Amino acid sequence: MDKTILGSIDIETLIRHLMIIIFGLVGLTGNAIVFWLLGFHLHRNAFLVYILNLALADFFYLLCHIINSIMFLLKVPSPNIILDHCFYTIMIVLYITGLSMLSAISTERCLSVLCPIWYRCHRPEHTSTAMCAVIWVMSLLISILNGYFCNFSSPKYVNNSVCQASDIFIRTYPIFLFVLLCLSTLALLARLFSGAGKRKFTRLFVTIMLAILVFLLCGLPLGFFWFLSPWIEDRFIVLDYRLFFASVVLTVVNSCANPIIYFFVGSFRHRLKQQTLKMFLQRALQDTPETPENMVEMSRSKAEP
């Protein structure tokens, strides 16, 4: 029997929820800073619009998990099951939105490298803003329809064909986004490392690659769990429980990691003295190879308000 603390909460469950709260608070702070700087202090280009929306999705995703863990540890009862389903639906929306934003960033970066002339001359000006709006609407629509047909409907309608179709779609959609993310990333890497198109890496490229790598390690397991859960839960009940909560903790780590990546890439090979968070973020999202001239220009920007 597992050792318990705080009444009936076992040590493993306590540690898991404490990890979610600790990582979540770090991520909340980091994503709030990123959103504040990108929203009010930096000029936004095509990629920064996606990163701004990614920070917003990560912020609210972490906030939902922190609230859920605190309520669990304090044993605060939920008012009713409808609110539980709504809360769960919101977290699905935010998870799918984050994955969609990352896939859009990778795809747009791939297009900017593979088709540079078209990208600079013929790409509509507000494509990034429009794509972000589409992503939010799609994520909301998919999650709300699934919640309506499978959770909010009368029990006698829960197992109907519409619910099953919706359930299959929401399980396979993250896998589709994962395939799109991988294909665009592989195409980008192939072009950058090929002899004809070989070019210097920018800090923005490094930032995107690190964010994708962290997502593949920490964010994607939950998507695979959703996809495989119909086969897992019927055969391995204990394994199903442990895999689910392990994947949830990993998604919290993933949402917490992006601001750390930005400030790590932005501060790499630069002295921390007299540097601001704005300068770190601006440097991490810089899309031009570093030269002595633009390094001097970046150092001068610290004098700006």
Curated annotation (Swiss-Prot):
Sugar-modified residues: 151, 159
A GO-annotated cellular component: plasma membrane
Entry's Gene Ontology molecular function annotations: G protein-coupled receptor activity
Signal peptide: none
Annotated transmembrane regions: 18-38, 47-67, 86-106, 130-150, 173-193, 208-228, 244-264
Matches recorded under InterPro entries: GPCR_Rhodpsn, GPCR_Rhodpsn_7TM, MRGPCRA, MRGPCRFAMILY
UniProt name for this protein: Mas-related G-protein coupled receptor member A8
Lineage, uppermost ranks: Eukaryota, Metazoa, Chordata, Craniata, Vertebrata
